[in-house]
């Protein structure tokens, strides 16, 4: 491994660990550490690129005893072992300086499997786990995984047949526990799955919980933009300052599900919806992510990054860097011990 690159990844990992649970008296030190990591990232990024922090990738091993609940054979090309060796070199070549993993499985022990899988690899700096919010074992499971500082939050598969937000007493207890620990909540909100009105109710009920809506908030192409979707997006962004939007999985706008389908690679196919998200949430609340390897069902990793870079370029390097890496470093960290 190139020594300077290894130093970069170690610096970023150290920065995130230092930021996690940082007491107020040490805020200045945290800021200095973050600035140093950003500077080193910029120095070591491949020529002609700016740094990227990846916030949404998945690993799984279908060949393990018992397999995995998802993907299934129906997902075709991604129903195979997907491990760090499949991703790391490709990501580095595309300017990714650090990556966060999102757990795709609802099996509690699979959270530990991921943490163990990348324990010795500082390139993978944070992990969004998967626990059933509202489950009787939630508090115990969260306390267990919270001992690992890389465990920064939870993916929002919530109790109920539709994995929906009910704000039941059990869910509220779990969500407040998450907020109390300074962790984050990733949510899918599209169609009947966690409708925007329910996300708004959640953000109001737990205002100190940082929430991020994955994959463009369920945007669907082509233009013109659906008026109801736009209204709901703008209302949510306005009412809920604790809600962020993941600028991720662009190809979903056209794909009919997790099946092989060639989505467009031209910015023009996405720009109208991107504009809604940018004007609603602003550059401070958009966070890049890919949804690799799922995106490979519909297009290439490189092309998706190119779409993002092309869209952000006219807005200047400050906006680009916020969306593509700086916002991620601020959002995906533990704000309390």
Whereabouts are the PLM-identified features?
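Alpha-helical packing segments of well-folded alpha/beta enzyme cores
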Residues: 86-90, 110, 141, 174, ...
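Mid-domain alpha/beta scaffold segments of enzyme catalytic cores
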Residues: 28-173, 177-181, 193, 268
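Bacterial N-terminal signal peptides
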Residues: 10-20
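Mid-to-C-terminal alpha-helical segments outside catalytic/metal-binding sites
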Residues: 4, 9, 26-53, 78-98, ...
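Active-site-proximal loop/turn and secondary-structure-junction residues that shape catalytic pockets
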Residues: 106, 133, 158-160, 189-193, ...
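Catalytic pocket-lining loop regions of alpha/beta-barrel enzymes
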Residues: 31, 152, 165-287, 336
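Short glycine/proline- and charge-enriched loop/turn segments
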Residues: 67-75, 260, 302-308
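Conserved, mostly hydrophobic/aromatic
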Residues: 56, 114, 154, 178, ...
């Amino acid at each position: 491994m190139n020594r300077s690159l290894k130093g970069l990844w170690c610096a970023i990992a150290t920065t995130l660990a230092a930021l996690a649970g940082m007491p107020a008296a040490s805020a200045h030190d945290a800021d200095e550490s973050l600035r140093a990591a950003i500077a080193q990232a910029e120095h070591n990024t491949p020529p002609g690129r700016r740094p990227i922090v990846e916030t949404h990738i998945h690993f799984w091993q279908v060949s393990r005893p018992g397999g995995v609940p998802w993907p299934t054979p129906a997902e075709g090309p991604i129903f195979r072992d997907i491990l760090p060796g499949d991703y790391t070199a490709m990501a580095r070549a595309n300017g990714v300086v650090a990556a966060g993993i999102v757990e795709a499985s609802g099996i509690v022990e699979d959270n530990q499997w991921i943490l163990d899988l990348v324990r010795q690899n500082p390139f993978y700096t944070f992990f969004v786990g998967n626990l059933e919010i509202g489950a009787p074992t939630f508090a115990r499971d969260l306390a267990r995984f919270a001992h690992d500082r890389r465990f920064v939050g939870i993916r929002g598969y919530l109790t109920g047949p539709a994995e929906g937000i009910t704000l039941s007493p059990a869910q509220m207890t779990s969500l407040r526990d998450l907020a109390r620990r300074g962790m984050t909540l990733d949510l899918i909100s599209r169609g009947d799955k966690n409708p925007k009105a329910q996300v708004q109710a959640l953000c109001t009920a737990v205002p100190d919980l940082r929430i991020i809506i994955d994959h463009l908030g369920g945007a669907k192409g082509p233009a013109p933009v659906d008026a109801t979707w736009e209204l709901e997006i703008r209302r949510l962004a306005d009412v809920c300052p604790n809600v962020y939007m993941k600028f991720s999985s662009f190809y979903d706008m056209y794909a009919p599900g997790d099946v092989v389908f060639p989505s467009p690679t031209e910015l023009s196919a996405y720009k109208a919806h991107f504009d809604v998200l940018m004007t609603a949430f602003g550059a401070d609340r958009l966070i890049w992510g890919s949804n690799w390897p799922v995106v490979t069902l519909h297009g290439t990793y490189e092309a998706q990054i190119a779409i993002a870079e092309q869209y952000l370029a006219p807005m200047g390097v400050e906006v680009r860097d916020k969306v593509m890496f700086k916002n991620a470093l601020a959002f995906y960290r533990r704000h309390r011990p």
